[in-house]
Amino acid sequence: ITESTVNEIHKVLRSCFRQAVKWDMMEKNPAVDATVPKAKKQEREIWTAEMLMQALEACDNKMLKIAFHLAFTATLRIGEVLGLTWDAMDISEEAIAANRAYVYINKEVERVSKQAVEELNSKDIILIFPSQKKNNKTVRVLKSPKTDSSKRKVFTPKSVAQCLIELKKDQEEIIEALGNEYQNYNLVMATTFGLPIGDSYLRTKMQDIIDELGLPDVVFHSLRHTSVTYKLKLSGGDIKAVQGDSGHAQADMVTEVYGHILDEDRRKNAELMENAFYNKENLNPQMKNQ
């Protein structure tokens, strides 16, 4: 059993015993003073921006390509990508020309158990999508984000805004052709008949590209990590701006969890120090004779 598993079990027990103390079923929470091993944080492997560009160039799947662009430029979770709707953005010609095109993240698609939906009494659930199979114990729902900080406006590069415009035109042609057969939920990431694209579909198509190009075997969520890392580099470490895009409640989450320092940058730092400090020609006269 791993340290992380022990820690997860301890969290559950501590929560259960805490509730038992509140209900006067026991006097003290025995899990509070328990000694648990420190779980070693394993840094997730991520794609570099160059690797993502390779994947985009090799990708011939329209929906996956859009998902790549959104996850990277808007720092979205996969549920947020799938829950994006056309009314939650401004990709007008005026907005694009003024560099103020944006997407607004205020919904996400998630698969939950039918029992959970009943127990929640549809709290935070905007709509329940029809099941494809009769005996499914789970349903996909469009729901509000878990935290208020997850609701955010993210400005979009012109190229991505143009991709969205092209996708919207394609979708409108499908809607016109299918008529009432199209179930219009106003989703950006929609199937031919209007239902939300499945996260497993995106993961499968992404895995195909990984296998084809021999890229590091990462999960879709890692694109969010790539996004944060790249934005930190571009902005010169503007943590608050990047936090605004990522929707993290605390800024330290950006630096602690996503602040990947790439080997390429570390090598560049060594080169910069060599040229700026150890190159005798660059030293001031007093230091040259030391």
Where is each model-derived feature located?
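N-terminal core-binding DNA-recognition domain of tyrosine site-specific recombinases/integrases
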Residues: I1-R18, W23, K41, L195-Y201, ...
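C-terminal catalytic core of tyrosine-transesterase DNA break-rejoin enzymes
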Residues: S4, K22, H69, T73, ...
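Proline-centered turn/helix-capping motifs that create local helix->coil transitions or kinks
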Residues: A20-P30, D90-A97, R111-V117, E166-N180, ...
